[in-house]
Amino acid sequence: MSVYAIIGGTGLTQLEGLTLSESLPIETPYGAPSAPLQRGRYAGREVLFLARHGHPHRFPPHQVNYRANLWALKQAGAEAVIAVNAVGGIHAAMGTGHLCVPHQLIDYTSGREHTYFAGDIEHVTHIDFSHPYDEPLRQRLIEALRALGLAHSSHGVYACTQGPRLETVAEIARLERDGNDIVGMTGMPEAALARELDLPYACLALVVNPAAGKSAGIITMAEIEQALHDGIGKVREVLARVLAG
């Protein structure tokens, strides 16, 4: 059975129900990961957990050490990665509280350390990234959502923006024209780094706010925090179902 790694995003800095066996403060050639890895059992299965933004939450999206995070998970024995991401909803179907398992992404970030193939290396590898998410792992998430009867979208295009600010109305209009359904700040370079390490990777996205211009008012942190509070239980249900399967 594969050893799953779960990367928890905003609202999931710890995995309730994880029977912790050890905390691993792993050092990597790229520095320290966001937090010590947690190894334990969840839903009867060995799992690794990492809080993407640190525990407590202290790293904004553009300052997360994505290279160290993925490297540490690989070194600790991860064989597949499920990433949990809080996102804004662009498409009308992506209302607050909706869950999405995206099948594609577009990267709008800049200036992030986005590859392991940099510096003094012996050869460059051009990974195929046509389909950024691992399809069998995506299907595991979708099957769990269906079995639980949770409202979800089994496809979607994830726009990854630089942050940490939220987007303008005009920027969201552009993202929508580009074909994006949801918008977040942490999907890249995480997905590409996982591919470079040959780690199957899929995303479970929780919509926590309508994107700019998609509601009458402005977006507030209170609104986002309430949506996280209301929705994170569903995320845990899905993770438990996948791991128990």
UniProtKB/Swiss-Prot annotation:
One of its GO terms (molecular function) is S-methyl-5-thioadenosine phosphorylase activity. It catalyses: S-methyl-5'-thioinosine + phosphate = 5-(methylsulfanyl)-alpha-D-ribose 1-phosphate + hypoxanthine. The record marks 167, 221 as: Important for substrate specificity. GO terms for cellular component: cytosol. Keywords: Glycosyltransferase, Purine salvage, Transferase. Although this enzyme belongs to the family of MTA phosphorylases based on sequence homology, it has been shown that conserved amino acid substitutions in the substrate binding pocket convert the substrate specificity of this enzyme from 6-aminopurines to 6-oxopurines. Catalyzes the reversible phosphorylation of S-methyl-5'-thioinosine (MTI) to hypoxanthine and 5-methylthioribose-1-phosphate. Involved in the breakdown of S-methyl-5'-thioadenosine (MTA), a major by-product of polyamine biosynthesis. Catabolism of (MTA) occurs via deamination to MTI and phosphorolysis to hypoxanthine. Involved in quorum sensing. Belongs to the PNP/MTAP phosphorylase family. MTAP subfamily. This is S-methyl-5'-thioinosine phosphorylase. The lineage of its organism: Bacteria, Pseudomonadati, Pseudomonadota, Gammaproteobacteria, Pseudomonadales.
